[in-house]
Amino acid sequence: MGPIAPEQPPSMPATASAACRAEGWTAAAEANSRSLIDPAWAPFGRPEAGWEIYVALIQHEIGTGCPANSEGFAAALGAWQGVNGQGGDGVVSEPVFLALKSVVQTRREFVRATASGACPETPDLITAARLKEGYGEKQVWMRPRALDAYRRMVAAARAAVPEAAADPEMLTIFSGYRSPAADAARCQADGNCDGIVRARCSAHRTGLAADMVVGHAPGYTVDSSADANRLFMTHTATYRWLLANAGRFGFVNYPFEPWHWEWTGEAP
């Protein structure tokens, strides 16, 4: 797979501001600039080219707003590496990203609950969302407290993000609770029961997961996992607000899917 050619703004300015310069990190910044869109790897099991899709996630985790090709980004990554036992050279490599991915993934209650191979039972109680909360007025369901948290988060996002306030479809849910029987039928129909797209034990069976609209690239659907579409999503103000603020409402993201968020206020 070659470099992505998105129809969105570039992910970083050509030059970093003075605040993103850091003495001693030039070589690391240059290495990050070279690897951003070129190397082939598969951090989530599917071949990808480079790590540009995950820039916003990495920036959030290492606590910097500096662009990925800057010395400031490299310095912040180096500090994160030091704290997390990953050396400290400031270079995004596959081992470093996988370590960061592990930190993010283990915040998901569902990941911890399924680590032993067990799959959570379906909830005893789910509640219907309002039709306007479903994408295209689709009827969706979640656990009651998860739905309440979703509503509080969406209200805060729309108050803070003009993009989300202006588009009534932004942050609507296109998939909430899904029964195991429905998931099994879908994965059999798609011929992909064990891959990324369909999983035998899906977080959606818990009633805690919500796939939310965070934008989509021209020509793609809101749930397309095409690299160009995922890259577009990570540039939206709505997605970046969620990265910074969803945790306040108990939601965590599955990094491969910018649209997939899980509420952690109850056990799966």
Q: Positions of the model-derived regions?
A:
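Glycine-rich, flexible loop segments associated with nucleotide phosphate handling
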Residues: 65-73, 167-172, 228-239
